[in-house]
């Protein structure tokens, strides 16, 4: 049974099993991914969405809504409490506003941002970072509540700024967000050093993912892109540029 499998490939066993349960055939899955694994870039969600689309497309037509549902089910085999945020963005593309109670809303605006992703190559565990945040909350309830309120306000501000295409101000908000993350203890010396380089050479830089390792990202524009890439490469960091994809899953 699926529950007995202990492997990061568990979501694919789930998808394959579900797709052929009433069919007299097997299935072989090969995964080719350029996304660094376990680096806070949503590689598992991207693979779950691609896997669900590819596997179920073999047996007939499938809508994006159905792909998303299957991808989230598959991801839950390894991350039980996943919000589905990463799978949703991978499926539909663009920028998503996510609220735990209201769900997802796509922002109908396509800003021309350039991102630089920088990998610390430090292993980290999402679970241990979540525990660390929980521990901080239990010990510092008032401070945690204050930071949560500041974060909610910051998200509201960023949503407005994205719609107005104000890249410089968005960068400042990213730096502010990074301060909040450092306050709750999910950064470390190496990430702080990387972020300092990013903040000095771009509009803003912060941790992506759960922290403790993995990647950071810096926000820039076309004219400054090569300069930032060079800065990080000169400091022996693995980095690459990325743009926001507004199509999402495009095999349909």
What are these regions (language model features)?
Residues 1-10, 14-17, 58-61, 69-81, ...:
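C-terminal nucleotide
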Residues 2, 31, 35-37, 48-51:
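Metal-dependent C-N hydrolase catalytic cores
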Residues 12-39, 70:
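Glycine- and acidic-rich phosphate- and metal-coordinating loops
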Residues 32, 174, 207-211:
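Short beta-strands and strand-loop turn motifs
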Residues 34, 212, 244-246:
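Residues that form or immediately flank small-molecule/cofactor binding pockets and catalytic motifs
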Residues 38-48, 82-93, 206, 210-213:
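FAD-binding core of FAD-dependent oxidoreductases
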Residues 41-62:
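DPxDG-like acidic metal-binding loop motif
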């Amino acid at each position: 049974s699926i529950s007995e499998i202990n492997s990061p490939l568990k979501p694919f066993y789930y998808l394959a099993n579900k797709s052929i349960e009433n069919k007299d055939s097997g299935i072989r899955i090969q995964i080719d991914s350029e996304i660094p694994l376990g680096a806070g870039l949503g590689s598992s969600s991207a693979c779950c969405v691609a896997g669900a689309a590819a596997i179920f497309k073999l047996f007939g037509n499938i809508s994006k809504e159905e792909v998303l549902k299957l991808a989230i089910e598959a991801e839950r085999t390894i991350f039980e409490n996943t919000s589905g945020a990463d799978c949703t963005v991978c499926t539909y593309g663009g920028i998503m506003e996510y609220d735990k109670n209201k769900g997802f809303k796509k922002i109908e605006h396509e800003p021309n941002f350039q991102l630089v992703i920088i990998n610390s190559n430090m292993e980290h565990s999402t679970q241990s970072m979540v525990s660390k945040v929980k521990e901080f909350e239990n010990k510092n309830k008032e401070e945690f509540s204050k930071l949560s309120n500041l974060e909610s306000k910051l998200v509201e501000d960023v949503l407005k700024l994205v719609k107005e295409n104000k890249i410089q101000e968005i960068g400042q908000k990213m730096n502010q967000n990074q301060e909040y993350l450092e306050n709750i203890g999910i950064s470390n010396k190496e990430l702080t050093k990387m972020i300092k380089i990013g903040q000095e050479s771009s509009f803003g830089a912060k941790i992506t993912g759960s922290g403790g390792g993995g990647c950071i990202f810096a926000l820039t524009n076309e004219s400054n892109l090569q300069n930032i890439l060079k800065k990080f490469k000169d400091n022996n960091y693995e980095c690459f540029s990325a743009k926001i994809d507004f199509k999402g899953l495009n095999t349909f």
